[in-house]
Amino acid sequence: MNAHTLVYSGVALACAAMLGSCASGAKEEAEKKAAEQRALLVESAHADRRLMEARIGAQESGADTQHPELFSQIQDVERQSTDAKIEGDLKKAAGVASEAADKYEILRNRVEVADLQSKIQTHQLAQYDGDSANAAEESWKKALELYETDSAQCLQSTVEALESYRKVAHEGFGRLLPDMKARAGAAKTDVGGLKVAVELRPQLEEADSQYQEAREAEEVNARAKAFSGYHRALEIYTELGKVVRLKKTEAEKALQSAKTKQKASSDLARSADKSAPLPENAQGFSKEPIEVEPLPNDRLNTTQADESAPIPISDTSSPSRVQSRGVEDGGRSPKSSMNEEGASR
């Protein structure tokens, strides 16, 4: 093998090595891009699922009706994610979807925070856990400042605020619960001793249901829910007791009014009797039985009955009856009459 052949062989081997290296690099690059694409697809799917759950959670909390403008703004962000996905920019779509999900969860937390703030203020619960109350206020203030600039940090601050507010409510309602339970129980017993009308039964059933739910919540240490249930039951029982007693009072007044009118009528009759007394044993006012004359129709019926009665037939076989009949004819016997008739002949 000459020198030229060796040179050509070396060059060929080098080119082959270079070509193999390039092919290998291209394959690795393609595999890398495919892996990145799969990762983006997974990330996008995860973001979409979280976005859907966050939106449903916000709606179930009532955020869409309590804060319609903010909810509409988040829907606009959600549409941007959909547009990016249509354009094939999965990375942008996933990022925007995560931002929209953060804001939906922030809005949901905002509804719960507002509810806890109202309860804490109404029942003055901050006095039972001042440290947690202060921490809650600080975290919530920070969340409001971060809403427009950093949704992830804003969401974290709302979570911290919620945890602190819940501690305040849990401690405060725990202090107030025994008294509220006792009051609700007393009201329940009070109504149980009353006669509740049929039309008021639905209110009684609602109160009983609230009371039972409060007991169940107390058993699982859900103090806020238990307090709320007992409080609502107390309100219904109290109002129901007022209505039942009012109806009873009205019925008693009506009965007393009727008795008063009856007494007044009796007094008036006695007064009239004293001023113009009736004759003793006056007809219609005597205790003796009254003789009632028959009506004209009754007389007519009596006469017709007499006329229709059969006339008794004389018994001619009795001498006494014949003699008696002869006496009635002028004192002449049948024999003398016959003699007189013969003489005349």
Swiss-Prot record:
Lipidation (N-palmitoyl cysteine): C22
Signal sequence range: 1-21
UniProt-annotated stretches for the region Disordered: 256-345
Keywords from the named record: Cell membrane, Lipoprotein, Membrane, Palmitate, Signal
UniProt KW Signal keyword: yes
Skewed-composition ranges (Polar residues): 314-323
Subcellular location: Cell membrane
Topology versus the membrane: Lipid-anchor
GO-annotated cellular components: plasma membrane
Lipid-linked residues (S-diacylglycerol cysteine): C22
Similarity comment text for this entry: To T.phagedenis TmpA.
Protein name: Treponemal membrane protein A
Naturally occurring in which organism (per UniProt): Treponema pallidum (strain Nichols)
Phylogenetic classification of the source organism: Bacteria, Pseudomonadati, Spirochaetota, Spirochaetia, Spirochaetales
